[in-house]
Amino acid sequence: MEERCNAIDDDCDSVNYEGCGYGPGFMQVTASWDTGADVDLYVTGPLGDTLSFQRPSTPSGARVDHAGRGDCSGDMPNPQIENIRWVGERPAGGIYEVEAHYWGECITGGGPTNVTVSVAVGREIAGQYTLSLLPGERVRV
């Protein structure tokens, strides 16, 4: 099976997203969704730093390298994907909190939206989670 850029390891090689236009890192959190809605991904680290489209990088090497906008933005590759990764040094040890937020319905998206969030550590899938979000809802994964 071929990789489909959907936050699921479709080809079962324990590595997500080969050829999807965004990169892996020592740690990586990716969200994908199934409507034209704009869904935002937030990751808060043990030092209290929150990464999102509003704060796309930290001095520790974390960065948002793809922030999809669903149907809210016209000409964007992979508009239903958000990807946060840590490059360079290992991320700080501790607990990381991941949240998904159904920001808006955009032009054609709307209603309940299924969101898949995957977490990879050392380029290996550590967990995949599926949520159903309603407009305006923000949920801890």
Predicted features and spans:
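Extracellular calcium-associated, cysteine-rich motifs in secreted modular proteins
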Residues: 1-24
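Intrinsic-disorder/low-complexity signal
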Residues: 16-141
